[in-house]
Amino acid sequence: MHDWNVDPHMAVPVINQLKDSGIEAKGLFGQWDHDYPDRPDYHFDRSGEGRGREAYPEMVRFDWMQDLLEWFDWYLKGVGEQPGLFVEIQSNQGQWRIEDRYPPDGMESISLDLGGAMMNVAGTTTILPNGDFGPIYESEPFEEPVWISALPRLHVDVSTATVGGQIYALLEDCSEAGDCIHIGHAIMDLRYHEGGTQEQTWLPIFQTINAKMEFFAMDAQIEAGHFLRLSLASTGEDYLPASTSSIVQISEGSSSNLILDTIQEGDKLLFDPPRCTHPYCQDWLNQTVG
């Protein structure tokens, strides 16, 4: 569930498309880096705050090998019992649960409008093609915990100086003290603002378009008292500037919304995986508890 080399969008919502097509499929979607059970410190320093660290060491699972063996035994040899065709999904805080599908069914949506429920704290609505953050929005602190699941969207009205432009959206979970961690991001070439593969055109400066952005899949638990921060730029970490760079002007209001799908913890089947017993895992747990 992190953008390392296997990206979340390679599996989400593909897992549901497979199921809907009658193809038997199972998912094991963790927050992991390459922290294998026999060397859980292998890439530990790379999994920093907001990049999987909060899910450590619950991300270190050795039972996936048993799952894989049972899968191949059944489907290649006809041996044993058919594996359960469900999705095991891990939140950014490390909690594992079972879902029939992912994105799951029966979620509730929260819509936060830019300039309203998402307050502009940067004092600008302009994104310059230099990679620097322009508009920055923050929500009010949540009164209750919020569990964001799967594919948040950012639908935003914009105008551009030319037929082009790009928007990078960074979504962060911020504590009452203002300490923030990355929970996800989205990026869009505005020539494809309607989505899909067909390039669109419009009248620069004079015409407003609605960019229908979708975030990489995320599963993020937000504590009560925390707030969300949405920062917009022309490009971001691990991305190149757009080949059609342009000044982008954000239009705030009811047509520009951050849309979050949420789940209720009490409705879900949570579980704890086999515990990592490597000394590195134990030392980390003792350190965080202390």
PLM feature segments, named:
Residues 11-23:
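Conserved loop-alpha-helix segment in the C-terminal half of the alpha/beta-hydrolase fold
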Residues 64, 76-290:
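Glycine/threonine-rich phosphate-binding loop and adjacent beta-strand/alpha-helix elements that clamp
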Residues 1-5, 58, 218-219:
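Short, charged/polar micro-motifs that form catalytic or ligand-binding hotspots
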Residues 1-3, 32, 235:
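Acidic beta-to-alpha connecting loop that harbors the catalytic carboxylate
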Residues 4-12:
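Conserved alpha/beta-hydrolase "acid-adjacent" motif
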